[in-house]
């Protein structure tokens, strides 16, 4: 099915690809774990899923550029090996990168949250020679519709009012922009990799922290999310900024006419609960 893409990857690697196994995740893309005849393992991203496929050249190029910036930093990011941004050889935008050891979390502990906060500070300390694009909000106004089965409709309305107000000033910071436990690899309790750099941006540090917290709230519950916010406040030496926490939570609402991002009603309920907390300032 991916013969052209695998042939291209083999030409980049200098060794024929002998196996290609799907990796979990990959909302935007098909992610394949490759092994070539020389025994080298790598990962191939193919931008197959809409609407990201239509922006595949931009997204895959940004990921490669971010990984190049990170080569000589303490951030454990994959190494970019090859890019076919226009899909000339592969049919869709393709990015070949090294494969990092480790696996995603299935449960989260206080020690994991500490490690996440420390890594986020390490990411934010990176100073690219040229800044990446200014962040894009995923909470655009067309999404500002109270979820049908919300237990906190007034909280959503207040959230929309927060976003309608001017955003607070911030110090431009290098952002992963999709930072969270889903994009981290772990081994023996330590982070061995941070992946998925297609959304790398410049923006407020609290937006990265907010996204990590929202993910924790939706996938687990509010307690690890609240704990991560507290840990990031301590690590960064800054107070939580409600605007960015609200922006990230609202960003999980679907565009008009689309189903909820999370098909699991329990996840939808946890998002609803988290939004209520962040609107009230996590008091």
Where are each of the predicted segments found?
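Juxta-kinase regulatory segment immediately upstream of eukaryotic protein kinase catalytic domains
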Residues: 1-19
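Active-site acidic catalytic loop and adjacent metal/ATP-binding pocket
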Residues: 24-25, 29-35, 42-44, 80, ...
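ATP-binding glycine-rich loop module of kinase domains
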Residues: 33-59
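A glycine-centered beta->alpha junction motif in the catalytic cores
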Residues: 48-50, 86, 94-107, 145, ...
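Conserved protein kinase catalytic core
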Residues: 51, 69, 104, 184, ...
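Structural motif at the C-terminus of the N-lobe alphaC helix and the adjacent alphaC-beta4 loop
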Residues: 65-75
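A cross-family kinase active-site recognition segment
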Residues: 78-172, 199-204
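Helix-rich C-terminal or lid/interface subdomains of diverse kinases
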Residues: 202-204, 211-283
